[in-house]
Amino acid sequence: MIYQSTLNKPLTISGIGLHTGRQITMILRPAEPDNGIIFHCTDGERRVSIPAVSANVVDTRLATVIGKDGLSVSTIEHLMAALSACGIDNLHIDIDGPEVPVMDGSAAPFVALLQETGNRVQEKRRKYLAIRKPITLVDGEKRVSIIPSRFFRITFDIAFDHPCIGLQHRAIKVNTETFRKEIAPARTFGFLHEVEYLKANGLALGGSLDNAVVIGEEGVLNPDGVRFEDECVRHKILDAVGDFSLLGHRVLGHVKAYKAGHDINHQMVEKILANADCWQLVESGEAASHGSLSMTGCAAMAMAGVAEA
């Protein structure tokens, strides 16, 4: 898709917050070109608008949290990943709680609702952040790098000392169709002892086997098991798509990550923005000339077969 897009019409989404356990409602409203994604939250007395960009990230310990003027919205990464993959550039999001609903722990419900609502193409051309030089970030065992690519690609490796996870590897060229089929259904995951600790400390109050893969000493506790043998690494890719969307533009680059999470993802986004000599903003017409439209949403599915050099 050459041009920016927003939703066809308002979309209301309700669900439980993972950490608060509260019922939360969001109203996603169409926005003008170049608006970006903006969350509007309230504490009952005032309304604060928080653009979903890296500069507004205030916490990455358990999820990606954006905030401004003392108010914040947590766990935005699954929704942001779905918006990016479905080609939504501009949106107002009214939210009546401190976190995005967890839904089933994946991005699949968001993708289904967005595709049912549909996109409205706008008159402004879309811009891409095209990586021109490699950038690498290392934090202990965690590593993230990004190198030039004509598409948005993610290669991810994780390593856990548990037989249910162990070593997992997945590489993907991210577009609407691959995201919908291979990444969006992957749920957040955690170990039983971690969940118990969080709940004892007033967190993960909305967490359950209905919205997370929970792993005990003997294996996965969910009655239906996992959706993919490598569901955990797929979910890490989902998180990365959401976290890298906070660059404010779709990426043309190949992300390679090892043991990465929200913290180092955010650090990498900040490092990219700080090294302006390593990237260039290009308009969609120029990106299309390089065969780069496979990232751009529902109308771009037909481009997914374009060969990459």
From Swiss-Prot:
GO cellular component: membrane
Catalyzed reaction equations: a UDP-3-O-[(3R)-3-hydroxyacyl]-N-acetyl-alpha-D-glucosamine + H2O = a UDP-3-O-[(3R)-3-hydroxyacyl]-alpha-D-glucosamine + acetate
Active site: H262 (proton donor)
Pathway, per record: Glycolipid biosynthesis; lipid IV(A) biosynthesis; lipid IV(A) from (3R)-3-hydroxytetradecanoyl-[acyl-carrier-protein] and UDP-N-acetyl-alpha-D-glucosamine: step 2/6
Keyword annotations: Hydrolase, Lipid A biosynthesis, Lipid biosynthesis, Lipid metabolism, Metal-binding, Zinc
GO BP terms: lipid A biosynthetic process
Pfam families (UniProt xref): LpxC (PF03331)
Enzyme Commission code(s) on record: 3.5.1.108
Family indicated by similarity: Belongs to the LpxC family.
Function according to Swiss-Prot or TrEMBL: Catalyzes the hydrolysis of UDP-3-O-myristoyl-N-acetylglucosamine to form UDP-3-O-myristoylglucosamine and acetate, the committed step in lipid A biosynthesis.
PANTHER family the record matches: UDP-3-O-ACYL-N-ACETYLGLUCOSAMINE DEACETYLASE 1, MITOCHONDRIAL-RELATED
HAMAP family, alphabetized: LpxC
Protein name listed in UniProt: UDP-3-O-acyl-N-acetylglucosamine deacetylase
